[in-house]
Amino acid sequence: MATIGALLLRFFFIAVLMSSQKSWAIKEEHTIIQAEFYLLPDKRGEYMFDFDGDEIFHVDIEKSETIWRLEEFAKFASFEAQGALANIAVDKANLDVMKKRSNNTPDANVAPEVTVLSRSPVNLGEPNILVCFIDKFSPPVVNVTWLRNGQPVTEGVSETVFLPRDDHLFRKFHYLTFLPSTDDFYDCEVDHWGLEEPLRKHWEFEEKTLLPETKENVVCALGLFVGLVGIVVGIILIMKGIKKRNVVERRQGAL
């Protein structure tokens, strides 16, 4: 899906160094990232804060609302969404200028890597969550579709915003709540400007192969037998060593 697009991306890094009060030696290093972008031809932007790789909050541009990743965060801090909207407006204006100066050269497309896994160990009949992890891609635009038995699923789905990486690429998580069953299989289909065709990752329940009881007994018996043989051989070698030493001592005494 090769689509020409333009992207203005700004990263601001704030390093927070935590030091020990006793030794004044630096023990840990944390990073807060303010990431914002405006994208064409989608005509959309994003504004978010990240702490050590985890989202703190982002601003819903359409609703002019600050969305905290965890509700508890809002009890300790606040952020006015209007500030983010002002930044996005500046990004849009700057992008228009940069497009003209660069002769409308589009940003390079980097195709994503996609992984599908369950959030927790899967047990039949127990609710769980499938995670579609989309990583190492640019620009920040993807279309994601969950499929169950080949059919699109729209209920029980959620997603994160685009999360920045240290290498200026992006990552994103999509989630699907599901009830594990041997009759169902799932796919996460990802479309991106860097892909020639949508990339689909498959997941289905796989029963754990348990070792039959008879084989377990054979393995245990074999292990016990090998252990006993080792003990017997060890005792024989020790006894031979003692006898050999006694013979040598007697000969030396006779001399």
Curated annotation (Swiss-Prot):
UniProt source species: Mus musculus (Mouse)
Name of the protein described by the UniProt record: H-2 class II histocompatibility antigen, E-U alpha chain
SUPFAM superfamilies attached to this UniProt entry: Immunoglobulin, MHC antigen-recognition domain
Spans annotated as Alpha-1: 26-109
Gene Ontology terms: biological process: antigen processing and presentation of exogenous peptide antigen via MHC class II; immunoglobulin mediated immune response; positive regulation of immune response
GO CC term, one of those recorded: plasma membrane
Ranges annotated as spanning the membrane: 218-238
Location (main, coarse): membrane
Record's keyword terms, sorted: Adaptive immunity, Disulfide bond, Glycoprotein, Immunity, Immunoglobulin domain, Membrane, MHC II, Signal, Transmembrane, Transmembrane helix
Lineage: Eukaryota, Metazoa, Chordata, Craniata, Vertebrata
Keyword ATP-binding attached: no
Encoding gene (name): H2-Ea
Residue ranges constituting the Ig-like C1-type domain according to the UniProt record: 112-204
